[in-house]
Amino acid sequence: SLGLVGSEMCIRDTYNSKGELMNNQFIENGQDKIHQHFFTPENVKPTFDGQPEADDNDPQKLVDYLYVDTTPWDKTRHDKEAEITGGSNPVGLKGVIRFLKDRKEFDLKIRLYHGYKSKGNPETGTFDPFYKPSGILIQRGTWDINLNIPVVVFWSREETVGVDEDTNPEGVEEDGLDEKSNRAIHSIMGTFNLTWKEALEEFIIYTYKSGDVEAGAIWL
């Protein structure tokens, strides 16, 4: 399952076609030693109001991923019942992706590697980076999961709009804000096919009324 929080996407659980949690199949009985998720952006292009950049096809400039798997896998550090071990044993059943560029569209290729004997790179003695499984690793294993998810990063979480919680959208004329605010609202309009008023309402709800999901709703 995926959870989007601002410019971050949290990876939590994997389910089978019956809706049954199957994380344990990739962790227990030594399976954590041969499994690792990889996340690779492909087919990158700017959104309707974005601009192409020279490094758009450099995965490290587009996304960042942090493996935050825990031991035990079904406990949380928040409850002080587990330790984060993703750095020394990356699996990717728990992790956070940060989208580093705004106004980009791409396919996020998510793959779960299953090594025949190991998930370590025998040439480097380390684990391959989250965005690029090596050729030798691919030769020595297979994919348990291989899928693409379309991603649109339509604006930056640092962008602001010159309205407050009590602003009445009815009283704000289209393009009646400052230049940066107008651009942000038009990005929302174009992405979700909304009117100026609808986009302004959505921004106010998201910014002021949706609650602080980062204050503890997602626990590792």
What annotation goes with each model-predicted range?
Residues 22-72:
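Extended, polar beta-sheet/loop recognition surfaces of beta-rich domains
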Residues 2, 34, 105-107, 146-148:
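Extracellular structured ligand-interaction cores
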Residues 19-22, 95-97:
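Extended, compositionally biased non-globular segments
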Residues 7-8, 70-143:
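Exposed beta-sheet edge/beta-hairpin loop segments within beta-rich domains
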Residues 123-219:
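Short beta-strand elements
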Residues 12-17:
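Beta-strand-rich structural segments
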Residues 2-11:
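Short, small-residue-biased leader/transition segments that mark boundaries at the very start
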